[in-house]
Regions:
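Glycine/proline-rich active-site loop of Rossmann-fold NAD(P)-dependent oxidoreductases
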Residues: 139, 167, 179-182, 193-203, ...
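NAD(P)-dependent short-chain dehydrogenase/reductase
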Residues: 140, 174-222, 227
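NAD(P)-cofactor binding segment of oxidoreductase domains
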Residues: 82, 96-127
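N-terminal Rossmann NAD(P)H-binding glycine-rich loop of SDR-like oxidoreductase domains
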Residues: 10-30
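NAD(P)H-binding glycine-rich loop region in Rossmannoid oxidoreductase-like domains
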Residues: 56-106
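Mid/C-terminal beta-alpha module of Rossmann-like enzyme folds, strongest
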Residues: 233-282, 292
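Amphipathic terminal alpha-helices
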Residues: 2, 9, 307-321
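Conserved Rossmann-fold NAD(P)-dependent oxidoreductase catalytic core, especially the SDR/UDP-sugar
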Residues: 112-161
Length: 321
C-alpha cells in the first residue's frame, strides 16, 4: 500500500465533509497522523484521536481557512500528502442566489494558496477532488479523460459554474505539476452515494410530489459511485508514481440508471401518484457515462458496487424525506 511510505503527516482539506471525513477515518485506521483543514468539525466534533489535528476550524463558511494564506501555511507544515477535497459551494449558487464572484475568489484563491504552500514546503503528492461536471453537455454517450470539457453548456444540477470552477482548479494543479514539479493527481468524481444517502436531485423529488405526468427522454440517465470506491482510489494513488500528473475518472458504470427506471422505482417505494411517460422526440440531456479504463489500467482500481446497492441506498435515503 503506497500510504506505508508516508513519513510525516497528511492533510485533508474538507475533512469534515461526507467524502473527506471517510477518507480521514481510513487514513487514521492506517496509523497515519492526519490534519483537517475545514471550517467545521463535522462528525469529529467529539473526536479525541491522538493522531487527529484541526486547522482553521471556526472560520466563516464563505471565508474559510483556504483563503487565509497564514492558515494554509500552518496546515501544510510537516505534511507529505495533501488531499484537496474542500470546496465552498451552495446548491442554489447556479441560480445566482449567491455571488459567484465571491465563491470563485475563495475557491480559486484557496486552491492557489494550497498549491503554493505545497510547493514551498516540499509536499510529496497533491491529490485534487474534481468532478465529472467538468465534461458538461456532450454529444457522445461515453467520455474519457481526453474528451474536450464543455462545462459552460451544462443546464442541469449542479449548474455550469460548478464545472467551470472545478476545471479551473484542475488546470492550476496541472500547472504546478508541469512548471514546478509538484506531483499532482486529479480525480473527476461522479455523483457519490453512501449506504444511507443516495437522494436524487431536488428537481426529481419535487416532480414526484406534484403527482402528475413526468416526461423523460428514452435512454437518459446517470451513473454514480459509492464513497468506498472513491476512498479506495485515493489510497491506491497516494505516492504512486503512476498517478503523478494524471487525470482519472471515478465512476461506476454498473450503477447507471435511466430516469425512467429511477422514477418507476421511486413511485413504487413512495406514496407518489405520479406517472412516468417516455418521450423520444426531445433532445438528450447530454449526460454521458465516464470511462474508467485509464485508472483501471494504471492503478488496478476497479468499482465493486452494483445498481442494487444504489437502490438500497435510495430506499434508505427516502426515510429522511
Amino acid at each position: 500500500m503506497p500510504t506505508d511510505d508516508i513519513e510525516k503527516k497528511v492533510l485533508v482539506t474538507g475533512g469534515a465533509g461526507d467524502i473527506g471525513s471517510r477518507l480521514v477515518k481510513a487514513l487514521l485506521k492506517r496509523g497515519l497522523k492526519v490534519k483537517i483543514l475545514d471550517c467545521q468539525y463535522g462528525p469529529f466534533k467529539e473526536e479525541k484521536h491522538p493522531n487527529l489535528e484541526f486547522v482553521g476550524t471556526g472560520d466563516s463558511e464563505l471565508h474559510g481557512g483556504m483563503a487565509n494564506r497564514d492558515i494554509v501555511q500552518k496546515a501544510v507544515a510537516d505534511v507529505d500528502v495533501v488531499y484537496h477535497l474542500a470546496i465552498n459551494w451552495d446548491g442554489h449558487t447556479w441560480k445566482h442566489q449567491l455571488p459567484l464572484a465571491d465563491l470563485f475568489d475563495v475557491n480559486i484563491r484557496g486552491t492557489l494558496n494550497l498549491l503554493e504552500a505545497a510547493k514551498s514546503q516540499g509536499v510529496r503528492h497533491f491529490l485534487f477532488a474534481s468532478s465529472c461536471a467538468v465534461y458538461g453537455s456532450q454529444e457522445s454517450k461515453t467520455v474519457d479523460e481526453e474528451t474536450v470539457c464543455k462545462p459552460e453548456l451544462w443546464e442541469g444540477d449542479p449548474g455550469p459554474a460548478y464545472g467551470i470552477l472545478k476545471l479551473t482548479a484542475e488546470k492550476l494543479c496541472l500547472l504546478y505539476h508541469h512548471e514546478c514539479g509538484l506531483p499532482i493527481t486529479v480525480f473527476r468524481i461522479e455523483a457519490v452515494f453512501t449506504d444511507s444517502d443516495a437522494l436524487p436531485s431536488r428537481k426529481i423529488i419535487d416532480n414526484l410530489r406534484k403527482d402528475g405526468i413526468i416526461e423523460v427522454t428514452r435512454g437518459d440517465g446517470y451513473a454514480s459511485i459509492h464513497v468506498d470506491e472513491v476512498i479506495h482510489a485515493f489510497l491506491l494513488a497516494t505516492l504512486n508514481k503512476k498517478a503523478y500528473g494524471q487525470i482519472f475518472n471515478l465512476s461506476n458504470p454498473a450503477t447507471f440508471i435511466t430516469y425512467y427506471e429511477l422514477y418507476k422505482f421511486l413511485i413504487q417505494n413512495t406514496s407518489s401518484k405520479s406517472k412516468v411517460r417516455l418521450t423520444v422526440d426531445q433532445t438528450s440531456s447530454g449526460r454521458a457515462i465516464e470511462s474508467t479504463k485509464k485508472i483501471q489500467r494504471a492503478l488496478g482500481w476497479k468499482p465493486f458496487k452494483t445498481k442494487d446497492d444504489l437502490k438500497k441506498a435510495i430506499i434508505q435515503s427516502l426515510k429522511s424525506i
